[in-house]
């Protein structure tokens, strides 16, 4: 994965699955390298679960299998997985780009790898989307929605796409994925 960022800079939460609302089974405050390394290497059985999701024959089966994945709260530290549970922001925003062709995803990946504020991106669990972690200068919980919309607008203007609107919610979890070609820029700037 290369150079690690200052681990004290970006503290986030990981949860065992979508139902783990109080973060009982994983370290409460982890550095971003823990989920990023898992995404890149497929450890903790993640690669096998992602292969099963990508090879599922129906959307219902894919959705059911996704429920067993770890979820990451890139937005910050939460005592509970709801908006009132956020105690501090990481300054990170996760943009979720869904249902794109391989050609479109390749173009987006190539373009955003040159954007200095993109910290990381990786294929979504379904394989036809992209999760993009953007560094911002916002540490104010009340301003998260506005910050998200500004980042979202950058993607809309650049690619003519509308990222998943659910991610505007402060407590929206991100399913972990597997992508050995994950992009990581430890020197991303707001």
Which sequence ranges carry the predicted segments?
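A generic structural motif
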Residues: 128-135
